[in-house]
Amino acid sequence: MEYGLIGGRLGHSYSKVIHEMLCGYRYDLCPLPTEEEVRAFLTRRQFRAINVTIPYKLVVMEYCSYIDPHAKAINAVNTIVNRNGLLYGYNTDYPGFSYLCDAHGVEFKDRTVLILGTGGTHNTTWAVAHDRGAKQIYTVSRHPDPEKGEQT
């Protein structure tokens, strides 16, 4: 595989269609149901670049020689580039969400922010709001973690 997506279950993904239509290269979906399979896949390093989806955005970080500061802050890598056998980990959600905020004039400086939910984009949203100077950030969740200050 040269380019593709790894994750536990990929039936929901439109990544193959999007990448092949817009970029003109083959993009493979590679379901890896177990962490053991992910570790073996990363050890082989037989890819040029991959995207990573749940539940492996944290475990892949162990295999990266370099991790982008945004990915470190979010504690999740969703893109890995193989450069001569060294794996470089990035999180494209952070710049993507930042771009959307800029495009729509969303300001965070000295504001109070409410984030609804603790799903996949929570940490990204929180990090962008924090980095852009939010005064306070609250999270409301159906499954709160009181240690993180989350509420129902």
Describe each model-derived feature in a short phrase:
Residues 2-104:
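Phosphate/diphosphate ligand-binding glycine-rich loop within oxidoreductases
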Residues 4, 114-116:
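Conserved beta-strand elements of the Class I
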Residues 8, 117-119:
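Glycine-rich Rossmann-fold phosphate-binding loop(s) that bind the pyrophosphate
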Residues 44, 107, 131-132:
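Alpha-helix C-cap/termination motif
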Residues 109-112:
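Phosphate-coordination loops involved in phosphoryl transfer and adenosine-cofactor binding
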Residues 122-123:
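N-terminal Rossmann-fold NAD(P) dinucleotide-binding loop
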Residues 126, 130:
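Gly/Ala-rich phosphate-binding loop of Rossmann-like dinucleotide-binding domains
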Residues 132-150:
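NAD(P)-binding Rossmann-fold cofactor-contacting core
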